[in-house]
């Protein structure tokens, strides 16, 4: 779990996302509150529920990017899902409880990596012994099995060479466990327990014996470490810790929530809109979900929802769902100055990416101040005249601008290009000024 302060979280987000300070502060405080809650007494801790967030803002302003970067900072089970992928219970499609099942699978993987990391040293020792056994086979007869000083010394010599990497390219025959073939069964609602039993049955049937393989010691060592570490992990403890991690630290990011708003008077069942909203209510409020790893309570899982709300309003969500998303954050539309900052300030910005890509061909590309101003202005103008798709417009404009250089780069190794205002004007002015061309090309 992340122990970063809100200011540190915002600083990390600033390295990748321009502006939107209100949204950054809200998610930073929400993430820090997860840590604060865990410092309370156990009894009092149960009373402190997370304050779920609804982020509202036009497309391309950073809502999804905030989620992506937050996932890396959280160091906790985190899942980002699109609300449009789910349907009401009883209809064909994913039901919303699948979100928690997927989140639990993520927690299992996270916990397994942590536990394997703790026992890695012991796993390395065991793997080392298995490789030495393959290099120096033990005698099969009892009268030869007594270890002599010379055989012990030989083993130590090989151990030293192995640790120094002198034997990395030597090939050996070792027995490696075969990967298990998983069988995924789609279960109807309420029959998850039977599905879990069937999956366990297929899992046991699919266990293949270890297979002898010939490989280099360097590759064998990596495989054997993973195999030995997996043996040292207690599966029951793993499941308990993972479920605890989901219940106490889990975060769900619900994207495109505006797409499940009811629009106008429609007849017939609203399978993937209002029905999904109703199914989300108990999940966000707190309920128990059956997963193949055990029962998971959702009372303290943090939900962050986001939507553009261009065709609808937050008030179009059913009132009960609005009440369960108490913190509202509005993200601002991007200006030409924001576009300019997006092109230069973030870590691995768009301009840096193109410079690095062309550098692989031996072509030097430089973006002047006037060139960056012109690119930002062009993207902003197209957004104003046509559909406003936010910062995503920069990708389209940059790709069109760099098209000629990218195409000819392989034949122009050693060349240098300066992208200034004149270059941008020559390549983009016709497209920006002509509204019809802008609609179809940019």
UniProtKB/Swiss-Prot annotation:
Record keywords, A-Z: ATP-binding, Chaperone, Cytoplasm, Nucleotide-binding, Stress response
Subcellular location(s) per record: Cytoplasm
One cellular-component annotation, GO: HslUV protease complex
Keyword Nucleotide-binding: yes
Residue sites binding ATP per the record: 18, 60-65, 255, 320, 392
Chief place where the protein resides: cytoplasm
Subunit organization: A double ring-shaped homohexamer of HslV is capped on each side by a ring-shaped HslU homohexamer. The assembly of the HslU/HslV complex is dependent on binding of ATP.
General function of this protein: ATPase subunit of a proteasome-like degradation complex; this subunit has chaperone activity. The binding of ATP and its subsequent hydrolysis by HslU are essential for unfolding of protein substrates subsequently hydrolyzed by HslV. HslU recognizes the N-terminal part of its protein substrates and unfolds these before they are guided to HslV for hydrolysis.
PANTHER family reported for this sequence: ATP-DEPENDENT CLP PROTEASE ATP-BINDING SUBUNIT CLPX-LIKE, MITOCHONDRIAL-RELATED, ATP-DEPENDENT PROTEASE ATPASE SUBUNIT HSLU
Sequence similarity: Belongs to the ClpX chaperone family. HslU subfamily.
UniProt-recorded name of the protein: ATP-dependent protease ATPase subunit HslU
Source organism (scientific name): Shewanella baltica (strain OS155 / ATCC BAA-1091)
Gene name, Swiss-Prot/TrEMBL: hslU
């Amino acid at each position: 779990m992340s122990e970063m302060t809100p200011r540190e979280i915002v600083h990390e987000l600033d390295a990748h996302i321009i502006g939107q300070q209100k949204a950054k502060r809200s998610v930073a405080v929400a993430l820090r509150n997860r840590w604060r809650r865990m410092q309370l007494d156990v009894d009092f801790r149960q009373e402190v529920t997370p304050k779920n967030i609804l982020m509202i803002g036009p497309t391309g302003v950073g809502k999804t990017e905030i989620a992506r970067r937050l996932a890396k900072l959280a160091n906790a089970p985190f899942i980002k899902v699109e609300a449009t992928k789910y349907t009401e219970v009883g209809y064909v499609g994913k039901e919303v409880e699948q979100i928690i099942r997927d989140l639990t699978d993520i927690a299992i993987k996270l916990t397994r990596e942590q536990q394997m990391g703790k026992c890695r040293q012991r796993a390395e020792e065991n793997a080392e012994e298995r490789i030495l056994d393959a290099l120096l086979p033990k005698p099969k007869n009892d009268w030869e099995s007594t270890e002599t000083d010379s055989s012990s010394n030989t083993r130590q010599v090989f151990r030293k060479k192995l640790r120094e990497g002198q034997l990395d390219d030597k090939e050996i025959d070792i027995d490696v466990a075969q990967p298990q073939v998983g069988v995924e069964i789609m279960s109807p609602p309420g029959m998850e327990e039977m599905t879990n039993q069937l999956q366990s049955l297929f899992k046991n049937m699919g266990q293949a014996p270890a297979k002898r393989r010939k490989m280099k010691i360097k590759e064998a060592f990596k495989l054997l470490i993973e195999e030995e570490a997996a043996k040292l992990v207690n599966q029951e403890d793993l499941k308990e810790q993972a479920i605890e991690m989901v219940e106490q630290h889990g975060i769900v990011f619900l994207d495109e929530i505006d797409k499940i708003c009811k629009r106008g008077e429609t007849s017939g069942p609203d399978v993937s809109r209002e029905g999904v909203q109703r199914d989300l209510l108990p999940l966000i409020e707190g309920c128990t979900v059956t997963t193949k790893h055990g029962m998971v309570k959702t009372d303290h899982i943090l939900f962050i929802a986001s939507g553009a709300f261009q065709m609808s309003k937050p008030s179009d969500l059913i009132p009960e769902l609005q009440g369960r998303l108490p913190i509202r954050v509005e993200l601002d539309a991007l200006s030409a100055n924001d576009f300019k900052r997006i092109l230069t300030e973030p870590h691995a910005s768009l301009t840096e990416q193109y410079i690095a890509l062309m550098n692989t061909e031996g072509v030097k590309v430089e973006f002047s101040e006037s060139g960056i101003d012109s690119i930002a202005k062009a993207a902003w103008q197209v957004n104003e005249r046509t559909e406003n798709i936010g910062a995503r417009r920069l990708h389209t404009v940059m790709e069109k601008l760099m098209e000629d250089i990218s195409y000819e780069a392989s034949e122009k190794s050693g060349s240098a290009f300066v992208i200034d205002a004149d270059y941008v004007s020559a390549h983009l002015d016709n497209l920006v000024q002509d509204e019809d061309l802008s609609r179809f090309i940019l």
